[in-house]
A protein has these predicted regions:
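Periplasmic/extracellular loop-to-transmembrane helix junction in inner-membrane transport proteins
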Residues: 2-22, 37-78, 99, 244-253
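Interhelical loop and adjacent transmembrane-helix boundary motif
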Residues: 55-62, 214-263
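Hydrophobic alpha-helical transmembrane segments of multipass integral membrane proteins
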Residues: 69, 73-81, 85, 89, ...
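Transmembrane-helix boundary motif in ABC transporter permease subunits
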Residues: 78-110, 123, 273-282
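Transmembrane alpha-helices
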Residues: 79, 158, 180-218
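C-terminal transmembrane helix and the adjacent membrane-cytosol boundary/short C-terminal tail
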Residues: 93, 159, 163, 201, ...
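Generic hydrophobic transmembrane alpha-helix motif, especially the helices
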Residues: 111-148
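Glycine/proline-centered hinge or cleavage motifs at structural transition points of membrane proteins
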Residues: 117, 176-177, 190
Length: 287
């Protein structure tokens, strides 16, 4: 095909191809530089004592175990609350809602909420959950704020996954006498589970990397608390702790060490999402 091109068109095609490769190379180089720089500055400080210890200005020790646990608490609580809401809303919008105008309005609202800066969710969460409902800054207020923030993402990703299921599957199940819910439960959801799981894992990644919404709602506490105590006690996550140490003079190396841990977690979460989605899609295709 390229042999039939004129020299001018061939030169233009070569120039555009080179430009595309250059853009791709610069993007990869920037990503590798960012990861390498963070690991170079922070990874030497990631020790077992750093991961399993607690911070104390009196003893002059630094540890991020409380922040790791607070992050885990918020991830578990937020996902436990948002999954039934998000998946249920997506099933209703895709399978049950009859008024398309209402569906389009809700879809527009979810897309709009997805684009709102997270700091605004944090401000609203502080005013409503912390002050109005008197929950105090802690894991519970932070989790509820994140539920509101990531709910549109769960709804949209689940909707898109449900829409990929062929309509013939639904018609076949209904023709065999299955009820509406039985058809959704036994036919639609199993064929859409790969996209739903991938969306949930990516939502976990967003929770782990969130800081702005938690500054006002989860607090800055670096104290080790159990789950029940942390619900209503100031509990800094890894990202909030990174912010605290980055603004503390002389603690920049600690901030880079936390950034290294967060970078590893992000890479693991994204890799898990990719592998899980691929495996579930492969298993779904072989059934």
């Amino acid at each position: 095909m390229e042999r039939n091109l004129s020299p001018r068109r061939r030169a233009y095609d070569l120039a555009m191809r080179s430009l595309v490769w250059l853009c791709a190379g610069l993007t990869c180089a920037l990503l590798l530089f960012l990861i390498g720089f963070i690991f170079y500055r922070g990874f030497p400080g990631v020790t077992w004592d750093f991961l399993s210890g607690t911070s104390s200005y009196i003893k002059d020790t630094i540890g991020i175990l409380p922040n790791i646990l607070n992050t885990l608490y918020i991830v578990l609580l937020a996902m436990a609350l948002v999954l039934p809401l998000g998946v249920g809303a997506a099933i209703y919008l895709t399978e049950y809602a009859a008024d398309r105008k209402v569906v389009e309005l809700i879809e527009f609202a979810t897309e709009t909420l997805t684009g709102i800066p997270s700091i605004i969710f944090g401000l609203v969460g502080m005013l409503f959950f912390v002050q109005k409902m008197n929950l105090q800054a802690g894991v519970l207020a932070g989790s509820l704020t994140l539920v509101v923030m990531i709910l549109p993402t769960i709804v949209r990703t689940t909707q898109e996954s449900l829409k990929t299921v062929p309509q013939s599957y639904r018609e076949g199940a209904l023709a065999l006498g299955a009820g509406k819910w039985r058809m959704v439960r036994t036919v639609v959801l199993p064929n859409a589970v790969d996209g739903i799981v991938t969306g949930c894992i990516l939502a976990v990644g967003r929770i782990v990397g969130e800081s702005a919404a938690l500054l006002y709602t989860a607090g800055f506490g670096l104290v080790l608390n159990d789950f029940v105590t942390a619900l209503h006690s100031s509990s800094a996550t890894l990202t909030v702790a990174l912010y605290v140490y980055a603004n503390d003079r002389g603690r920049t190396d600690v901030a880079f060490s936390i950034a290294s841990v967060l970078m590893l977690l992000t890479l693991v979460i994204n890799l898990t999402a990719a592998l899980t989605g691929r495996k579930l899609k492969k298993n779904g295709g072989t059934q």
